[in-house]
Amino acid sequence: MLPFWIALQFLSSLPVRLSGMPEPREMGRSLLCYPLVGLLFGLLLWLASHLLQGAPAPLHAALLLTLWVLLSGALHLDGLADSADAWLGGFGDRERTLKIMKDPRSGPIAVVTLVLVLLLKFCALWVLVERGAGALLVLAPVVGRAAMLGLFLGTPYVRPGGLGQALAEHLPRQTAGWVLLGSLLLCLLLGGWSAIWPMALALGVFLWLRRLMCQRLGGTTGDTAGAMLELLELTVVLGLALAT
């Protein structure tokens, strides 16, 4: 169970406290639990949506989005903001991009990106709420966190000595493949036919974003992994809103 608690502590704002620093091997194994953390988030969103039945759809969607952000402590939104600033401000240069990514300040590109992503997610949630498709909310958090596992499985980590390097080096790769397959089957089981098009769209976005990372950076960082998670969650909820 330790890898799950490590993953939950890292990916969420839930009050999880570990005694001491985990071993690198356990850190690597915690990646296997990322889709499970996503499933937990999705079930909490589904429960919240059920409890909010009867509330006006815009308020319902806004409260769901607020809970969604609070569950992760806006961790991945921070990565998205840093990546947006760095990608445009880096002008195609690897070292400049990495340097900007480490700057804690957010520029106008980061702000605009966050506003657009949250606005689109809010609108998609509004559509799903109005159509009574709250159960499909489980899918996006699972896909986003499974994508992080897939990214670390098949993409070099470019910041030596960082937490991400320990995760990537000690990830049980064969087991990770089975976890990804199980995550895919779970999403198809939960979403049925409604999940096929959004899942295919998410796969396409994953491959495109990974290609951009490899072309610019030669791999991934924690910030770009967080950005990918946010963009894939958005892709799934938009796909579901358009497909249902």
Curated annotation (Swiss-Prot):
Enzyme class: transferase
Subcellular compartments: Cell inner membrane
Membrane-topology annotation of the record: Multi-pass membrane protein
EC code(s) of this entry: 2.7.8.26
Highest taxon of the lineage: Bacteria
Transmembrane segments: 31-51, 55-75, 109-129, 133-153, 188-208
Cofactor(s) it depends on: Mg(2+)
Gene Ontology cellular component annotations, sorted alphabetically: plasma membrane
Record pathway: Cofactor biosynthesis; adenosylcobalamin biosynthesis; adenosylcobalamin from cob(II)yrinate a,c-diamide: step 7/7
Coiled-coil parts of chain: none
Key word Thylakoid present: no
Catalytic activity: alpha-ribazole + adenosylcob(III)inamide-GDP = adenosylcob(III)alamin + GMP + H(+); alpha-ribazole 5'-phosphate + adenosylcob(III)inamide-GDP = adenosylcob(III)alamin 5'-phosphate + GMP + H(+)
Main location: membrane
Sample GO molecular function, one term: adenosylcobinamide-GDP ribazoletransferase activity
Any one of the GO BP annotations: cobalamin biosynthetic process
InterPro entries for this protein: CobS
Family, as annotated: Belongs to the CobS family.
Biological function: Joins adenosylcobinamide-GDP and alpha-ribazole to generate adenosylcobalamin (Ado-cobalamin). Also synthesizes adenosylcobalamin 5'-phosphate from adenosylcobinamide-GDP and alpha-ribazole 5'-phosphate.
Protein name (Swiss-Prot/TrEMBL): Adenosylcobinamide-GDP ribazoletransferase
The organism's taxonomic lineage, starting at the top: Bacteria, Pseudomonadati, Pseudomonadota, Gammaproteobacteria, Pseudomonadales
